[in-house]
Amino acid sequence: MGTEKYISEVKVIASPQEAVYQRLSNFKNMEQLFNPDKLTELKKQHPEMPDLQLENFQATEDECSFSVSMVGTVGVQIIERTPSKTIKLAGSKSVPFQFSCWIQLAPVDEENCKLRITLHAELSPMIKMMVNKHLKNGIDQIAEALTKIPYV
């Protein structure tokens, strides 16, 4: 097993840093966004938004789980918060491999902020061959999708 590191592109979000942090640091705030009707509405408003193919999203304040095509059920928990700056996540209960993830926020100005996602995944060589490209693309798609959701 080896630890692989995946870093998203830096994305700019057209919302204040604190508003973005408040939305992302509580999984219950994300729950409404992942119902099929809301995803369809967001996709119509932002046709360039990537199709994340998440299903069965369930959440508490600190944990969530969802199904991802070609991966299966993924459980995620928030393990650390640094107000307005960082949200650290880790795999919980049901994950196909162990991982940790950081969502980093930085101000651009009072009305905009930057976001970057870093993923560390424990992958066997065989699993890495199968999912390496999907993880890199997926982390960029998630970062891009996070620029499209409403924060204020």
Whereabouts are the PLM-identified features?
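Short Gly/Pro-enriched turn/cap motifs at secondary-structure boundaries
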Residues: 1, 66, 93-94
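Hydrophobic ligand-binding cavity/cleft-lining segments
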Residues: 1-56
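Short, surface-exposed coil-to-beta transition loops
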Residues: 6-8, 71-76, 97-102
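Solvent-exposed residues in well-ordered beta-strands and their adjoining turns
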Residues: 12-16, 69-71, 81, 106-108, ...
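Hydrophobic pocket/interface hotspot
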Residues: 20-24, 30, 78, 89, ...
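Short amphipathic alpha-helical signal-transduction/dimerization elements
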Residues: 28, 135, 139-151
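Glycine-rich portal/gate segments that line the openings of hydrophobic small-molecule binding cavities
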Residues: 42-90
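Beta-strand/loop substructures that line and gate deep hydrophobic ligand-binding cavities in soluble
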Residues: 90-141
